[in-house]
From Swiss-Prot:
Residues annotated for AMP binding in this entry: T31, R36, K57, L58, V59, G85, F86, P87, R88, Q92, R156, R167
Principal cellular location given in the protein's record: cytoplasm
Biological pathway: Purine metabolism; AMP biosynthesis via salvage pathway; AMP from ADP: step 1/1
Name recorded for this polypeptide: Adenylate kinase
Complex and partners: Monomer.
Taxonomy, superkingdom: Bacteria
GO molecular function, one term: adenylate kinase activity
Reaction catalysis annotation: AMP + ATP = 2 ADP
Residue span of region NMP: 30-59
Gene3D superfamilies tied to this protein: P-loop containing nucleotide triphosphate hydrolases (3.40.50.300)
EC main group: transferase
Cellular compartments annotated: Cytoplasm
């Protein structure tokens, strides 16, 4: 089962990715997590990515495509995977298709911009695992602490309101065209496309996903 998640930053993709991973036992491939790991390790790619991400800009296609292709070739992706944050542009989608990867489901999470700004300002992240929480919508069991490890949660620099607005502008310009792209792919019989109302409660979105993928 090979799945692509579409939706603006803060649309709830990360939370639902956890549900899909637990339910179907496939790994999540998040380019954001990959780049954050590279940043933490202080690699050259990580330094380049950090400068761009801090400004709310996207990392160039050639860096991202190479990273993802290496990742989906690994053994744990044999039964499928979940792509979150890739592809972000039409050239990336074409590169994925050209590499012979067949996508089974494309899931779009639809949320208005103003809701996303409110959501992301309350987001808290466990840096090591990438687990994501929200102080209102999906709080940790203990305030400020990761449910699994008990370690501190952080506020990412790119969750600040001014950076969120910049990221949304980039999303609408570069990534929104993928909605039309994958709807056309679905009409051609190359994948299945579903749009979900991401303003629903987390549990309601999960139930809808269960019906679609089950």
């Amino acid at each position: 089962m090979k799945i692509i998640l579409l939706g603006a930053p803060g649309a709830g993709k990360g939370t639902q990715a956890q549900f899909i991973m637990n339910k179907f036992g496939i790994p999540q491939i998040s380019t954001g997590d990959m780049f954050r790991a590279a940043i933490k390790a202080g690699t050259e790619l990580g330094k380049q990515a950090k400068a761009l991400m801090d400004e709310g800009k996207l990392v160039p296609d050639e860096l991202t495509v190479a990273l993802v292709k290496d990742r989906i070739a690994q053994a744990d992706c044999a039964n499928g995977f979940l792509l979150d944050g890739f592809p972000r542009t039409i050239p990336q989608a074409d590169a994925l298709k050209d590499s012979g990867v067949k996508i089974d489901f494309v899931l779009e999470f639809d949320v208005p911009d103003e809701v996303i700004v409110e959501r992301m300002s309350g987001r808290r992240v466990h840096q090591t695992s990438g687990r994501s929480y929200h102080i209102v919508y999906n709080p940790p069991k203990v305030e400020g602490k990761d449910d699994v490890t008990g370690e501190d949660l952080i506020i990412r620099a790119d969750d600040k309101p001014e950076t969120v607005l910049d990221r949304l502008a980039v999303y609408h310009k570069q990534t929104s065209p993928l909605i039309d792209y994958y709807q056309a792919e679905a009409k051609a019989g190359n994948t299945q496309y579903f749009r979900l109302d991401g303003t629903q409660k987390v549990e309601e979105v999960s139930q809808e996903l269960d019906k679609i993928l089950g």
